[in-house]
């Protein structure tokens, strides 16, 4: 967790707002000392009730990724977050492939989950280029997460497939 401090500092020096994904409630105490203004919870954590409750109790906005979650899991996570007085929640639509072909992202699903759960929506973009995030914004996304790398040479599946520019 110590690697967060220099990253948060560097982001702030550049006028950015740093935040992080949390995977364990025990990590929140440390991350809170950094003044993290918002948290992201990965889709595979939708049934980790302790993490959901503890994150909600910070009173900070939460970005809830839905990429690998089922509708019942999303509903469950929202019930836990609401029960624990979560602040603003953004449901982040995601196609969990790298890179994601434009034809696979189904941005209608983004608006559908927003309507179904009466929540703000965003889009986690794994496509190449800017068409998908611009379209998502036009369709009502209030948050866009764009995956990219500044160096595609590391031996890693995601690094080899990510664009080098946002």
List where the protein language model places each region:
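Active-site glycine- and acidic-residue-rich loops that bind
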Residues: 64-74, 121-130
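Conserved, mostly hydrophobic/aromatic
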Residues: 31, 65, 91, 140
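Active-site-adjacent beta->alpha loops and helix N-cap segments on the catalytic face
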Residues: 41-58, 71-76, 100-109
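Conserved small/polar residues in nucleotide/adenosyl-binding loops
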Residues: 158-164
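Active-site beta->alpha loop and helix N-cap motifs at the rims of alpha/beta catalytic domains
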Residues: 1-44
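Catalytic cores of alpha/beta
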Residues: 30, 72-77, 129-139
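Active-site/ligand-binding-proximal alpha/beta "capping" segment
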Residues: 30, 89-131
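Alpha-helix-loop-beta-strand connector modules within alpha/beta enzyme cores
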Residues: 1-13, 54-59, 111-117, 160
């Amino acid at each position: 967790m110590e690697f967060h401090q220099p990253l948060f500092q560097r982001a702030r020096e550049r006028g950015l707002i740093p935040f992080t994904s949390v995977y364990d409630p025990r990590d929140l105490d440390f991350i809170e000392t950094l003044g993290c203004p918002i948290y992201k919870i990965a889709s595979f954590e939708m049934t980790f009730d302790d993490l959901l409750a503890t994150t909600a109790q910070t009173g900070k906005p939460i970005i809830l990724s839905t990429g690998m979650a089922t509708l019942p899991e999303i509903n469950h996570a929202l019930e836990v977050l609401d029960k624990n007085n979560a602040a603003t929640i953004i449901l982040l639509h995601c196609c969990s492939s790298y890179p994601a072909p434009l034809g696979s992202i189904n941005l209608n699903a983004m608006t559908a989950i927003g309507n179904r759960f009466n929540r703000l929506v965003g889009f986690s973009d794994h496509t190449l280029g800017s068409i998908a995030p611009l379209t998502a914004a036009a369709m009502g996304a209030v948050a866009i997460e764009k995956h990219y790398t500044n160096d595609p040479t590391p031996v890693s599946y995601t690094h080899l497939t990510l664009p080098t520019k946002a």
